[in-house]
């Protein structure tokens, strides 16, 4: 499942951008916090993702990731440029393809290759169009497959990128709050999109969503939006941590699917970015620990 939220000025107390995500996964799945150093690569190098191998970038940034132990990709993370990304499962009318890139692979690839949020949108969309998405999203369960949406942010702006097979739409957020929770939300007001959508002026959510596009007021997405609205103008990292730990909304999930890891980031225009991760289940009782992308 998952819930991902972002707050930008004037919603935040200090003018920063604050990002948060709960990763809801099979309860028995371990998720670890891992750092990967920046690197340069030779022409022709390939990188092995969870299921497929693709051309490596000339250079990759240092990243800190919250990573299910069995996969190459990550549920969420941050890079040395102050870009953060989290993904969400979405179920669409588009067909599922064969094993290809997982959404979690695209989270890691976007962080390793992008120096800004808008660049990460471009990178992930291009990878999606070329390589596609597909494959089992839980270890040992070939039936658990889905498409992906992403919330991507830096200290200036945020983007929601939603996908259905190789089609995609992206919405830019420059003020206020936004949250996503396992459903398509972008209708006709996208800022960028795949060529097929632009050519037919598509309503992305209406065309592709496997569920009704009308927001259920009892859903986690609706709850998350209300909780953000309640704190508008005063949102801090601690506010986001409290939202991630909320039980009434279902955002802090317990059960066969559970919140197995959580992350909050504060992105500042002066470059003083801060990241906190639990590296363990249940933000209602697990402390958030400061995490540097690069060790001092």
For each of these PLM feature ranges, what is it?
Residues 1-103, 123-240, 250, 260:
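A contiguous strand-loop segment
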Residues 107-114:
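Short, well-ordered beta-strand elements within core beta-sheets of diverse protein domains
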Residues 244:
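Catalytic-pocket segment enriched in acidic/His residues
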Residues 251-296:
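Substrate-recognition/cap regions that form aromatic- and gly/pro-loop-enriched pockets
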